[in-house]
Design a protein with these regions (language model features):
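Extreme N-terminal leader/targeting segments of oxidoreductases
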Residues: 1-37, 55-56, 496, 500-503
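Mobile amphipathic helical/loop "lid" adjacent to a hydrophobic cofactor/ligand pocket
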Residues: 4, 101-102, 106-107, 111-219, ...
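Mid-domain catalytic core of redox enzymes
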Residues: 4-19, 268-381, 386-391, 409
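Active-site/ligand-binding neighborhood in enzyme catalytic cores
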Residues: 32, 165-272, 276, 286
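N-terminal Rossmann-like FAD-binding beta1-loop-alpha1 element of flavoenzymes
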Residues: 33-62
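Glycine-rich FAD pyrophosphate-binding loop
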Residues: 55-79
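Flavin (FAD/FMN) cofactor-binding core of flavoprotein oxidoreductases
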Residues: 209-210, 400-445, 498
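FAD-binding beta-loop-beta segment adjacent to the flavin cofactor pocket
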Residues: 370-375, 426-452, 456-460
């Protein structure tokens, strides 16, 4: 019976992979006349656009405000007590359905650095653990199998209020947002009498998008669940890089861009651009195309300060409407101690007491961290709060609270000595809050040669986080290829409709 259902579900979901665009193989791939492209913002979206365009012969200049590339996957060195250490923006997971990003990683020969994580684990406040290894990976059947893990029970399936859970299987790229973008996950959980353990699991999932349950758009959550859990048979098991992002991803991407003639200007903050006579002026140079791939926090003032964009109300209104999400914090600790449970995966979610949402064990995951750990006989822990409460505003208070909650889950670490630390308190992640979707900008804009790219852009496919960032940059490149009568690059996605949705 299960095998029959698996086949039916796979067929309904188009074998879990569909093409986003149609490639005309009769068109040329490389441009033969000089066309200059300015890309502002060197995160994954900007790197994606730069790599795709430079490979085809475009004269690409990528402007990045920081010394390092990568944006939210950035990696850099810092000095502490006479040591030079590597740190990153924070932990990132490469899920198996990140089709476009992973294809690019294969192209630049960094796919080999991916290693699998064993389980998706949540630590509850009472000391119990929730894992997801062993459940059926087939969409729909995986929800039914949650009963094996105590997330659901028999009464959940026969409770009339639980019928509302079916909307999770009805993701629709238009109707879902029309109906549920103004409903919070908190409201949904209360209306459906969601079981406690299921709610804790969903709370952790919602916070992974840097939003509290009462602020998180139910439509965005349904899209996220569809993308990660209900559109493919890879389950929640994912891969991570086996060393820091600079060496395993960012340097190889930079080499790919520059080897194809692209230019990268670091430490170059672009505060404004000028649009005149159908072209863009950036840093006193003139460009045929411009891609804005900054984070939301820096995009909005750039749009407001730029000349020639004030005539375009959609650009002005839509960029003004999008928001940054709540403040978040990342604290990495180099210590003289280890967790006692050596069987844990590299990363765990925690049922926060006040602010701790996850712990990453870098000494188990990355080569450089493992080498430091072996030399210094201590673990490297990253503590992450995806959404800080309003009551925590001071850096020292946040750091102390994160450590206190770490000790709650790992009391054996209470006596640890901290040899080094690196703390980040930021507010630059895009909000997926209530009623944000309608005015969210798309890749194409009112100006035919201006494009947006980033994890904040509205895409025609249910893509999120790193995959959304990469895909948006690749889509911007494809639009430029199309304008120049060049062959597009094939892009792929999970199927854009839920198991019970009608097209």
């Amino acid at each position: 019976m299960r095998n029959w259902l698996r086949k039916k579900i796979k067929s309904k979901l188009k074998d879990y992979k569909v093409a986003i665009n149609t490639v005309d193989a009769t068109l040329p791939k490389h441009i033969t006349t000089q066309k200059k492209v300015a890309i502002v913002g060197g995160g994954i979206a900007g790197l994606s656009a730069a790599a795709n365009l430079a490979e085809r012969g475009f004269d690409v200049t990528l402007f990045e405000k920081n010394e390092y590339l990568g944006g939210k996957v950035g990696s850099w060195k810092f000095e502490s007590k006479g040591e030079t250490l590597q740190v990153e923006h924070g932990f990132h997971a490469f899920f198996r359905q990140y089709y476009n990003l992973r294809n690019f990683m294969k192209k630049i020969d960094v796919y080999k650095h991916l290693i699998p994580i064993d389980d998706y684990i949540i630590f509850y406040q009472n000391g119990k653990q929730q894992g997801f290894a062993g459940i059926d990976n087939t969409p729909g059947l995986n929800i039914f199998d949650l009963r094996k893990k105590g997330v659901l029970d028999f009464w959940t399936f026969i409770n009339p209020m639980s019928m509302s859970f079916l909307k999770l299987l009805r993701y629709h790229p238009v109707k879902t947002f029309e109906k549920y973008d103004g409903v919070s996950f908190e409201q949904f959980a209360q209306q459906t009498a969601m079981p406690k353990h299921m709610r804790l699991v969903f709370n952790s999932f919602a916070r992974a998008f840097f939003a509290e349950p009462h602020k998180m758009s139910l439509a965005e959550l349904i899209k996220g669940l569809h993308f990660y859990f209900l559109s493919n048979d890879d389950g929640l098991i994912y891969d991570v890089l086996n060393d820091d992002f600079e060496h395993t991803f960012l340097k190889p991407t930079e080499r790919f861009i520059t080897q194809h003639g692209g230019k990268i200007q670091r430490n170059t903050a672009i505060d404004s651009i000028e649009y005149t006579d159908g072209k863009f002026i950036v840093q006193n140079d003139t460009f045929d195309y411009c891609i804005l791939s900054l984070d939301v926090k820096h995009l909005k003032p750039l749009i407001q300060n730029s000349k020639g964009l004030e005539k375009y109300p959609l650009i002005q209104n839509n960029t003004n409407a999008i928001k940054c999400t709540d403040r978040y914090a990342v604290l990495r600790l180099w210590t003289d101690s280890f967790e006692s449970n050596k069987t844990l995966p590299f990363f765990i979610f925690t049922d926060r007491l006040k602010c701790l949402d996850s712990v990453t064990f870098y000494h188990k995951m990355e080569k450089e961290s493992a080498a430091w750990s072996a030399t210094n006989n201590g673990g490297i822990f990253e503590l992450h709060s995806y959404s800080l409460p309003d009551s925590l505003t001071k850096d020292e208070d946040i750091k102390q609270q994160l450590q206190d909650e770490l000790f709650h889950y790992f009391p054996e670490l209470k006596s640890m000595q901290i040899k080094h630390e690196f703390f980040q308190h930021r507010d630059d992640f895009p909000a997926f809050h209530l009623n944000q979707y309608k005015q969210r900008p798309t890749v194409q804009t009112e100006i035919p040669n201006l494009f947006f790219a980033g994890d904040w852009v509205k895409l025609p496919v249910p893509s999120m986080l790193m995959e959304a960032a990469y895909t948006s940059g690749a889509m911007a490149s494809n639009f430029i290829f199309n304008k120049e009568n060049l062959q597009e690059n094939l892009l792929e996605s999970v199927y854009g409709y839920g198991l019970l949705a009608k097209e």
